[in-house]
């Protein structure tokens, strides 16, 4: 028997897919900040030698896995179901392994860094401010489309289990899985 949460998650995913399809093509970015966000270019100033993935280490597995860098630590359970990649000097993405392997993206969250004066992150479709530390603004960017195969119940459950933890970043919960250094 299918769990009610799974059914609701799959229905919401389908609604999101239909809504995204109905919206059509995204408008061309108008400002330089929008273009920068669209192209995925580094968000910190290029003269800065900041590297969000500096000394990135992955530890653990099984029930818990930890991403540790010089700038933040993130601890999530369901360690065997997710992994991370350094996208650029200013972005690290955490993704669901199964969904990514099935070509559904699998992105759970991207941790991005901005200079405090750069507010271009406000144009991201879904984000939350993690905080400011050492002269940098840390942003969590969440996917705005379905990142797993909605017809695969197990894949949906695996994705949702870790996404619930990642969502604590958005909520600013006391038990948020991320700590800025």
List where the protein language model places each region.
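Mature, Sec-exported extracytoplasmic domains of Gram-positive
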Residues: 26-181
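C-terminal motif of bacterial Sec signal peptides marking the signal peptidase cleavage site
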Residues: 18-22
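Repetitive helical segments and hydrophobic/amphipathic motifs
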Residues: 12-14
